Amino acid sequence: MASKEKKLGRVVVVMGGTSAEREVSLMSGSGVLKALRDARVDAEVFDPQVQDIEELVSKDYDRAFLILHGKGGEDGVIQGLMEYIKLPYTGSGVFASAISIDKVMTKKVWESIGIPVPRGTTVTADSNMAEIIRLLGKNLIVKPSKEGSSIGLYRINDATPESLSEA
């Protein structure tokens, strides 16, 4: 039986990046790197914030373990690069990533195939905040449509047009 090192080849753990979730990615990536190395897998790190993309492209990796979060990591960008350079990678593909990073688009897709989703609406600076409160109620959760984890999440109890605008 082939060793894991030979079976998996050279693995690049793509972590860090430039999103608001950089620190989470670095912690997750460090855990992945340690687990791979503990399993005697030939693994090394690539961080797009501190390394040039040419370094990733020019090295002869056999596969990539993607552990980037948020913009640039879960939005189809790094997945598109992996497909362009023909490097197999973990996680969702370009299309699924591009759709799922956008909560508004994801909700529309889910609704279109009959998956129940909570009531909600897209809020912009031009939105009628009083009308949104009338439709959804005074206890609201507000979240950016394209951030991951709980970045930018606000819980508003007894919302007013002003508190909703601030969020």
Q: Which role fits each region the language model picked out?
A:
Residues 114-116:
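Short secondary-structure junctions
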Residues 8, 137-139:
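A general structural motif
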